[in-house]
Amino acid sequence: MPSSAKPCAPSASGAALRPVPTRRVALWQCTAALSLAWAGAAWAQGGARQVSSPTPLRFGILPFGGAVESRDRWAPLLADMGRAIGRPVVGFSVTSYESLGQALQRDEVDIAMLTAKMALDAVTQRRMRVLAQVRRHGGNSDHRAVLLVRKDGALNNLADLLGNPGRWRLARSDSRSVSGFILPQVELFLPNGISIETAFRSELVDTHQATALAVANGDADVATNNTTDLERFREQFPVEAARLQVIWTSASTPPAQIVLRRGAPPELHRRLQAFLAGYGAADGPRGDAERAVLKSLRAALGYEAEDDTALLPAAELEYQLAWQRAMNAAWVSEAAKQARLQRIEQTYARQVALLKDEGGAAAAGK
């Protein structure tokens, strides 16, 4: 993971501390400062506490390439969001899925853009609720997982990869990444008896940008990635991108979700959802500016209001992953295998029931 360190610094306005992505220790030092500064007015404390100025809303940002780049891309939308809700919105930008997952567990973000897998975890742990998701359209332009290799590399086709995975060096994303881990496992590797975590000669786990660079520079033979990040990579690294080719493409992935902390005031929930659903829809210069922001975030069609039922496809993917892992595992007995499969079925049934109940409650409250 990226490890360059910079100190936490106040914003130009002096309003609040913001964590600058660094090595993990520095990140959590910054986070602690944020938490202390804002804890007094957090709604989770249950208070209708009066404060002299609105408490900033902390927006968790998944890393695109670097954390600073991700924060800068989101800054215009967060500024517009703050004006719409009458409350500052500050970006909580991290260097990894793990860091953002820990921030969610520690209640250090209030709203976040998450992968479908991370959103599923946050919702089923009863920490967050779905506000909106990236709007998609059908066709080959949809967001899909891909496998990348060098055009002039020793590995240049899928048959060689599946036939002898132990020969090749893999670069992949965190296990919470749908396109960088889950879909390649479910659709390609596990059906061919290959465990992505153990079958390859070596393994690099990093961002989509870093995995593509690893293959382009000869530090890995194959990388998981996705069509959206590959498009961004081609714009930022045209020389390196020209060395790459796609040897496998998945079905369309579940969209990324924007989630809000459970217990947020209903009025805040409604205003945020209305802002996201309407962002980029206006005519004239304002709409043009918003659409440019959305394009930079690879959400050209904007966002659509959603509830927790939007995570049903993610729950099904998680079920398929767990089932295939169990079927490929070695078991001491058939009874042990069947017990595991039964637990997987029960977990999936509970998730579906929870998502449908929460979605129904959200719809009734509108």
Regions found by a protein language model. Name each.
Residues 116-126, 189-190, 216-217, 221-242:
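A ligand-binding cleft/hinge motif common to bilobed small-molecule-binding domains
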Residues 1-21, 25, 29-39:
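N-terminal secretory signal peptides
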Residues 104-105, 161, 215-216, 258, ...:
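Hydrophobic residues within well-ordered alpha-helices
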Residues 66, 72, 76, 271-366:
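An extracytoplasmic/periplasmic, membrane-proximal ligand-sensing/linker region
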Residues 47-120:
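Extracytoplasmic small-molecule ligand-binding "clamshell" domains
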Residues 98-112, 125, 143, 208-223:
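Short helices/loops that flank or line small-molecule/ion binding pockets
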Residues 55-63, 134-146, 238-273, 291-307:
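Periplasmic-binding protein-like
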Residues 54, 58-82, 94, 140-213:
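Bilobed "Venus flytrap"/periplasmic-binding protein-like clamshell domains
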